[in-house]
């Protein structure tokens, strides 16, 4: 066997290893080295004394870590052949160039380079870090720059200019006005999953929710699965309920790119979207169907935020065992959400009161 020492040399190896351990008992990693050495010696003894398979012995003495066994067996055999067991001593893994060993001048030069770089090239931390590693900004900075991205980023964050940029971004965000639509009847639609791990239900349910972007009025309908037919059925109910309860005529519905809303046919050349039964149904009802950009849930932000409120506001103790019971619970929640809960975005009015105030203005 390649990794098992010859039976005739086993006792000689054992004696030399014991002598090596006795000389290095003060070593920081003595216990760890001793454990690996004795595991290898005991494995070799059992291999020659009994009818054991090597893989069974590795499981027994090296806890099924084959790579650890091969690593130590190779080190021990090489040390025995060269008669130099010093290589068995473990060395510290602490890096030689830790962050505080870099000079302040190098740190300042790299920070200066970043703030010039981000203004000229509109680049970020990552692009400059890799450009430094490639030597684009000179061999001197390449050799002196930190090898770790976290260290590089920490330098920049502690610079005063970084704080000014962050404060400027915060001011811009504060000045940014909230996105609002001017018309009633523009709805966002999405599916919410109700799973037993988060809600007191007996199985997984799906709820198609609708929210009016202008008034924040919301309704939803429970189903056992996601499908185009269920999505169309939910829209039928929404058209009827929004008209009969709130007097709202739906003119547009925005959805994500779920398979129940659109069909994507992908190949190596192009992506084409085929009009589905869902889109055709909305067209027949004179309702515009919009879809959000791919991987852009913020485009349907109001319905996404509405779904986050479920975990905070939709609470019940008794376990729900069917879709009808869940729908009844949700109807109570929708009544609270539409008629009782005030919204900061609506000047601390309920969605229904805000709808009435709009009708009075007209």
UniProtKB/Swiss-Prot annotation:
GO molecular function: endonuclease activity; metal ion binding; nucleic acid binding
Highest taxon of source: Viruses
Domain Integrase catalytic per the UniProt entry, residue ranges: 179-359
A Pfam short name: rve
A Gene Ontology BP annotation from the UniProt entry: DNA integration
Keywords for this protein: DNA integration, DNA recombination, Endonuclease, Hydrolase, Magnesium, Metal-binding, Nuclease
Signal peptide positions on this chain: none
Annotated InterPro entries: Integrase_cat-core, Retrotran_Ty1/copia-like, RNaseH-like_sf, RNaseH_sf
Annotated binding of Mg(2+), by residue: 190, 256
Entry keyword annotation includes Magnesium: yes
PANTHER family: TRANSPOSASE, PUTATIVE-RELATED, TRANSPOSON TY4-P GAG-POL POLYPROTEIN
Known function: This protein may encode an integrase, which is necessary for integration of the viral DNA into host genome.
Record-stated family: Belongs to the plectrovirus integrase ORF3 family.
Protein name: Putative integrase ORF3
Organism encoding this protein: Spiroplasma virus SpV1-C74
């Amino acid at each position: 066997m390649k990794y098992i020492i010859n039976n005739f040399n086993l006792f000689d190896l054992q004696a030399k290893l014991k002598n090596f351990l006795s000389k290095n008992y003060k070593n920081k990693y003595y216990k760890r080295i001793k454990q690996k050495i004795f595991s290898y010696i005991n494995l070799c003894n059992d291999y020659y004394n009994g009818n054991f398979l090597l893989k069974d012995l590795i499981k027994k003495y090296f806890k099924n870590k084959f790579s650890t066994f091969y690593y130590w067996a190779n080190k021990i055999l090489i040390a025995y052949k060269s008669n130099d067991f010093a290589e068995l001593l473990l060395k510290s893994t602490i890096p030689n160039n830790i962050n505080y060993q870099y000079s302040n001048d190098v740190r300042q030069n790299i920070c200066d380079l970043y703030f010039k770089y981000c203004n000229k090239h509109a680049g970020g931390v990552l692009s400059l870090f890799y450009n430094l590693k490639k030597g684009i900004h000179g061999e001197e900075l390449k050799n002196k720059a930190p090898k770790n991205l976290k260290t590089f980023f920490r330098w920049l964050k502690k610079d005063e200019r970084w704080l000014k940029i962050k404060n400027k971004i915060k001011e811009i965000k504060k000045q940014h006005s909230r996105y609002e639509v001017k018309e009633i009847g523009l709805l966002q639609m999405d599916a919410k999953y109700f799973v037993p791990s988060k809600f007191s239900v007996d199985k997984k349910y799906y709820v198609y929710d609708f929210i009016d972007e202008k008034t924040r009025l919301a309704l939803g309908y429970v189903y056992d699965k996601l499908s185009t037919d269920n999505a169309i059925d939910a829209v039928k109910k929404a058209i009827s309920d929004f008209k009969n309860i709130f007097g709202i005529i739906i003119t547009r519905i925005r959805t994500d790119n779920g398979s129940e809303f659109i069909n994507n046919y992908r190949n190596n050349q192009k992506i084409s979207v085929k009009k589905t039964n869902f889109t055709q149904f909305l067209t027949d009802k004179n309702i515009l169907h919009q879809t959000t950009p791919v991987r852009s849930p913020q485009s349907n932000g109001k319905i996404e935020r509405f779904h986050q409120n479920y975990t905070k506001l939709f609470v019940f103790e008794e376990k729900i065992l069917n879709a009808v019971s869940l729908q009844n619970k949700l109807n109570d929640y929708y009544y609270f959400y539409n008629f009782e809960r005030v919204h900061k975005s609506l000047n601390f009015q309920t969605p229904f009161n805000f709808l009435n105030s709009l009708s009075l203005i007209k």
